[in-house]
Amino acid sequence: MRILIADDEAIIRLGLKATLEAMGHEVVGVAADGLSAVELARTAHPDLVILDIKMPGIDGLEAAEAISRERPVPIVILTAYSSRDLVERAAGLPVHAYLVKPIRPVELGPALEIAISRFREEQALRQEAADLQEALRSRDIVQQAKRRLMEVHGLGEEEALRWLRARARRERRSMREVSEDVLKGLPPFDNTPSA
């Protein structure tokens, strides 16, 4: 896996890099501050990002938010602080795992796996929500076209729906595409649509 590391302590960066490489990962970027981490994420295209919370400039949580806004990836937060307010702040952001320093290699592997798993679940939910939104938009368009056929051609509701279905089958197009044509007045319909 291609991983980006950001920590303001050089010793932590070196140790983390060595541990990750020993685990078989490729470290594609190392940053000492949050802004550099955001820039590196832009150019290195990591599969996962590990960020320290306390860094100069923008902190790890701000960097996590900026990185996720541009190109969502799994994010693991490292910190020497386990204060409740930091944990709560991290929980409200696109953070997929949270580790308290000093990091032991035995903890790092599972944290990466959990982060990847949570990220995938999050992405699947986003896709499902987008698919549902698209289905609702399609349904609304079909409903509008059905009403148009009922008003313009005097069809009953079932008759208008049958007409849309038959046209979609005949033209090998989706009901939404046929409905969009009806709403645009394309193609010109004769005065007696028939199933």
Regions inferred by a protein language model and the residue ranges of each:
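Alpha4 helix (beta4-alpha4-beta5 surface) of REC/receiver domains from two-component response regulators
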Residues: 62, 82-97
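Active-site beta3 strand of CheY-like receiver
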Residues: 44-50
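Receiver (REC) domain active-site loop signature in two-component systems and cognate sites
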Residues: 55
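Short amphipathic alpha-helix used as the core "switch/output" element in two-component signaling
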Residues: 39, 61-72
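Acidic catalytic/metal-coordinating carboxylates
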Residues: 33-36, 58-62
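C-terminal output helix
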Residues: 85, 103-112
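Active-site residues of response regulator receiver
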Residues: 52, 79
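Conserved acidic segment of CheY-like receiver
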Residues: 1-12, 16-20
